[in-house]
């Protein structure tokens, strides 16, 4: 009995000095996905997908957009009378056009290479409108009667402001030969057109000459147009049609016009005074009197996140577009508070845990650390070195992902005419395919980074445990739950030496050896006592059973219930 009491006293003495390795835990409910698991609760996580916008059109870095309201790009450039507010526009950051603007080509027809012109505008930030052929210079032609009820202004017939519809004068239409030399230092956007009458009567009524042509030439352009006279259904009250053309006239280049009828001459041209990143957005939004660094057709984005899922077409300093609904990066550890007894799935290294069943909510100044207990008390202490290394390792995680995904696929809002719908459909499928691949790669990268982060934390905890184990060696006992019981007295100074890696093993080895041997001896003597008692108990039980059997036999023989025969 004395031996058993000594054993209990010794065990309680050793348990009083103990050090444990653990990790931070908190009340977080944030969850992330990894390659191996879904919905892993972590102490800290960072959402890297922007889902919100303000629903407004804003200035981009202080520069207002050109919002065309009910006017199309064609209506603005040609000068639809209903678009007079855009006769002179200041510098713009981007252009906004509605999906189906009411004020387009008021006189029915089409704009040649319109989509290519829009693409050109996506690299321009400012036009300066200049007069190249004054309307008053057409002395041999009627430059005032070329108006139409299809282009009304203040209740009267009118026409596009930037071009002149030339009509015969005094029953004659002399052949036109005009040139304009671009003496500016900037490129010049020049517009002109041709009228296609409804019938021969309209042709001679307007131009006198039954057979006409228009020739246009520059150093890079050689064009000859003839009117196509045909009966057509009326559009905007007109059976005739107009076709408009454009070219970019380089500095010191000249454009030459020659025509004997059906000519819609340029009066104004656009000097391209500033080039830069721009775009034409299809949007029904109104101006919001706000400023942003990133604009989409759905609204402005003000975010520092690296990804967004709002719209593939953006302008400015924008996050990268993905089709994902959720992208969350793990920046902390698996969150398994100590009070939670349900076993969690283990990481690759099995540290958080495998042998450590829960985190410490009491340790708030670091990710990994120690809990000690001795005669002087107990407490938590973070391991600042390993924590700082871990913080350094995850601080730049978002930038690392951006660098790995540094090839942004740009969804360009291309437009195609009716003859190119098949190309448009193919282009859309290609863009959708690129975005699908881009999104998949992003999601996969996040899953891999999350797996790597959690395994990184697991590894750090295991490394800290091994650091203590290698110092203590046989001076302490591993308890299997992340804790060590000392075989010697370990005051606060001793505990601190374990934490900072300066533990003096030889200093405590003799005391530890004696206590370890004493505990082992008590266990062995106790085991011998238990063996003697066990043998005695077995013999006594067998003897008692034999006496009972013999007594029962004698009693049965005496009353005749049992016959006993002894043969010699």
UniProtKB/Swiss-Prot annotation:
**Which parts of the chain does the record assign to the membrane side Extracellular?**
17-531
Q: List the S-palmitoyl cysteine lipid attachment residues.
A: 557, 564, 567
Cellular location of this protein?
Virion membrane; Host apical cell membrane
Q: Does the keyword Membrane apply?
A: yes
One annotated GO molecular function is: host cell surface receptor binding
Annotated site (Cleavage): 346-347
> Has UniProt tagged this entry with the keyword Transmembrane?
yes
Per the UniProt entry, the signal peptide is 1-16
Main localization of the protein?
virion
> What cystine linkages occur within this chain?
20-483, 58-290, 71-83, 106-151, 294-318, 490-494
Which residues are on the Cytoplasmic side of the membrane? 553-568
The entry annotates sugar attachment on: 26-27, 39, 170, 181, 302, 500
Source superkingdom: Viruses
Membrane topology per the entry is: Single-pass type I membrane protein
What start-end ranges are recorded for coiled-coil regions in this protein? none
What kind of modification does the protein receive after translation?
A: Palmitoylated. In natural infection, inactive HA is matured into HA1 and HA2 outside the cell by one or more trypsin-like, arginine-specific endoprotease secreted by the bronchial epithelial cells. One identified protease that may be involved in this process is secreted in lungs by club cells.
Q: How does it assemble?
A: Homotrimer of disulfide-linked HA1-HA2.
Function, as annotated, reads: Binds to sialic acid-containing receptors on the cell surface, bringing about the attachment of the virus particle to the cell. This attachment induces virion internalization either through clathrin-dependent endocytosis or through clathrin- and caveolin-independent pathway. Plays a major role in the determination of host range restriction and virulence. Class I viral fusion protein. Responsible for penetration of the virus into the cell cytoplasm by mediating the fusion of the membrane of the endocytosed virus particle with the endosomal membrane.
Q: What name goes with this protein?
A: Hemagglutinin
Originating organism: Influenza A virus (strain A/Chicken/Hong Kong/220/1997 H5N1 genotype Gs/Gd)
Gene from which this protein is expressed = HA
């Amino acid at each position: 009995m004395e031996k058993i009491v000594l054993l209990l006293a010794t065990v309680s003495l050793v348990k009083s000095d103990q050090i444990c390795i653990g990790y931070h835990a908190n009340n977080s409910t944030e969850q992330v996905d990894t390659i191996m698991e879904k919905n892993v609760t972590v102490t800290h996580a960072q959402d890297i997908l922007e889902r919100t916008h303000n629903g407004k059109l804003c200035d981009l870095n202080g520069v207002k957009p050109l919002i065309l309201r009910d006017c199309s790009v064609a209506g603005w450039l040609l000068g639809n009378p209903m678009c007079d507010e855009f006769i002179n526009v200041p510098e713009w950051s981007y252009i906004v056009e509605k999906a189906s603007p009411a004020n387009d080509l008021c006189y029915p027809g089409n704009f040649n290479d319109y989509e290519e012109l829009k693409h050109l505008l996506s690299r321009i930030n400012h036009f300066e409108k200049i007069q190249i052929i004054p309307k008053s210079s057409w002395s041999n032609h009627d430059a005032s009667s070329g108006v139409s009820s299809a282009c009304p202004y203040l209740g009267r017939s009118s026409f596009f402001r930037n071009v002149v519809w030339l009509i015969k004068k005094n029953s004659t239409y002399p052949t036109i030969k005009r040139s304009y030399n671009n003496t500016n230092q900037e490129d010049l956007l020049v517009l002109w057109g041709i009228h296609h009458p409804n019938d021969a009567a309209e042709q001679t009524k307007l131009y006198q000459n039954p057979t006409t042509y228009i020739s246009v030439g520059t150093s890079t352009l050689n064009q000859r147009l003839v009117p196509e006279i045909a009966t057509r259904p009326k559009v905007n009250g007109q059976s005739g049609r107009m076709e408009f053309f454009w070219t970019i006239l380089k500095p010191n280049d000249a454009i030459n016009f020659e025509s004997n009828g059906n000519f819609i001459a340029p009066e104004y041209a656009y000097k391209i005074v500033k080039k830069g990143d721009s775009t034409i957005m299809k949007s029904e939004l109104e101006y919001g009197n706000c400023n942003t660094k990133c604009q989409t057709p759905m609204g402005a984005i003000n975010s520092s996140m690296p990804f967004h899922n709002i719209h593939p077409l953006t302008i400015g300093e924008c996050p990268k577009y993905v089709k994902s609904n959720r992208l969350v990066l793990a920046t902390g550890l698996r969150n398994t508070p100590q009070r939670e007894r349900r076993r969690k799935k283990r990481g690759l290294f099995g540290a958080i845990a495998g042998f450590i069943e829960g985190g410490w909510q009491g340790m708030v100044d670091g990710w990994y650390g120690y809990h000690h207990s001795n005669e002087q008390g107990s407490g938590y202490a973070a391991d600042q070195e390993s924590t700082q290394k871990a913080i350094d390792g995850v601080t730049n995680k978002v930038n690392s992902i951006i660098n790995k995904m540094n090839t942004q696929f740009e969804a360009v809002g291309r437009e195609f005419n009716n003859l190119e719908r098949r190309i448009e459909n193919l282009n859309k499928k290609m863009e959708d395919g690129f975005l699908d691949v881009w999104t998949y790669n992003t999601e996969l990268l996040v899953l891999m980074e999350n797996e790597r982060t959690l395994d990184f934390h697991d590894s750090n905890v295991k490394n800290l445990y091994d650091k203590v184990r290698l110092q203590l060696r046989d001076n302490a006992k591993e308890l299997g739950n992340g804790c060590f019981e000392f075989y010697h007295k370990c005051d606060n100074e001793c505990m601190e030496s374990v934490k900072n890696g300066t533990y003096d093993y030889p200093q405590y080895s003799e005391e530890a050896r004696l206590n370890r041997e004493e505990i082992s001896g008590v266990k062995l003597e106790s085991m011998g006592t238990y063996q003697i008692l066990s043998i005695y108990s077995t013999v006594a039980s067998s003897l008692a059973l034999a006496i009972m059997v013999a007594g029962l036999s004698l009693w049965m023989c005496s009353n005749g219930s049992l016959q006993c025969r002894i043969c010699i």
